[in-house]
A protein has these predicted regions:
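Short, flexible loop/turn segments with low-complexity composition
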Residues: 169-173, 292-302
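Conserved SAM/SAH-binding loop
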Residues: 44-49, 298-305
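Long, positively charged, glycine-interspersed low-complexity recognition regions
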Residues: 279, 287, 300, 305-308
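Short, conserved SAM-binding/catalytic segment
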Residues: 28-37, 282-298
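Core catalytic lobe of class I
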Residues: 1-22, 26-280
Length: 308
């Protein structure tokens, strides 16, 4: 899992020695067949094999980032694009059971791109009440000679009970620089004068343009081809999981939701089929023992894109 890299490259890799050290932190379906205690847990296995071993109604929040409906390699595995109806059947093969893991007041976020978004909405509406669709702007992405560059992804937000679910608006307000700092009788009007300049706290919308996709110079970067930013996961977790609650990440990949949950004082259960990605996630979780920082979040408010 290592190779020749620039000294400035901060991508997280796992050495053979680290793999031996980290392996005891990763469970298998056999390890949890007698029941799972809710110490923070990372399980290496096929989601369909693991779901039946997990109790119902344990998660305050589910963040599901399944393979999008495109042909793509994920480590040793690969996913192939398929007709929409077949992709929806694939989603149903695990989504219904994942929803049973939510508490009665739980929330679920389901990630996708423009190709899969309509299928995600359709399948989610069969099990949950859809409250919103978040669209977030990616900085990465290839241009196209005869089409618009694909620079957006979607996250569908659903709940079990639309009359009773957790949502903490104050925890996810965005700290934005004020370009026209008007004053009222000499005092700031709806903004705060700080040593760094004028800022205003704004309510988050369902369009996010303040998230940076991890790249080689960021300390959270990994070799996973579809890694989600910790900042993005932190927004979902702070909004929809109370302190001390449980976050379930059924397609953990390199563990962004699990890591963000740990840094923010939540518990987590992550399931990932690829052993190498489990090791990367385990290393990130170990790093989070001593470093709770999340880029773009100061511990109180979220900052604009590319803020430290």
């Amino acid at each position: 899992m290592t190779g020749s890299r620039s000294k400035r490259n901060k991508t997280i890799v796992v050495t053979e020695e680290e793999a031996r050290e980290l392996s005891p932190r990763i469970l298998t379906p056999r390890d949890i067949s007698g029941g799972l205690s809710f110490a923070d847990t990372l399980v290496n296995g096929d989601l369909l094999d693991v779901l039946g071993l997990l109790p119902d109604s344990f998660a305050d929040l589910v963040i599901a980032d399944p393979p999008y409906n495109m042909s793509k390699k994920f480590g040793a595995a690969a996913f192939s694009a398929m007709p929409d109806g077949q992709y929806e059947d694939y989603l149903r093969s695990w989504f219904r059971q994942v929803c049973t893991k939510l508490k009665p007041d739980g929330s679920l976020y389901l990630c996708g791109d423009w190709r899969s978004s309509s299928s995600l909405q359709k399948v989610m509406e069969e099990e949950l009440t859809v409250l919103n669709r978040i669209t977030w702007q990616r900085e990465k992405g290839r241009g196209a000679a005869s089409n618009w560059k694909n620079g957006m992804e979607d996250i569908w937000f659903g709940v079990k009970d639309p009359g009773h679910y957790y949502f903490d608006l104050e925890a996810v307000k965005l700290k934005r620089r004020v370009l026209a700092p008007y004053r009222d009788n000499g005092s700031p009007k709806d903004w705060e004068d700080t040593p760094d300049g004028p800022f205003r706290l704004t309510c988050p919308s369902n369009f996010w343009d303040d998230v940076s996709v991890p790249f080689w110079s960021m300390p959270e970067n990994t070799d996973h081809p579809a890694q989600k930013p910790e900042k993005l996961m932190a927004k979902l977790i702070l909004a929809s999981c109370p302190a001390g609650g449980v976050v379930f990440e059924p397609f953990a990949g390199s563990g962004s939701a699990c890591v963000a949950a740990k840094k923010l004082g939540r518990h987590f259960i992550g399931v990932e089929i690829d052993r190498d990605y489990c090791l990367v996630a385990a290393k990130r979780l170990r790093m989070a023992d001593s470093d709770k920082r999340i880029q773009g979040y100061d511990g109180v408010h979220f900052k604009e894109r590319n803020s430290p």
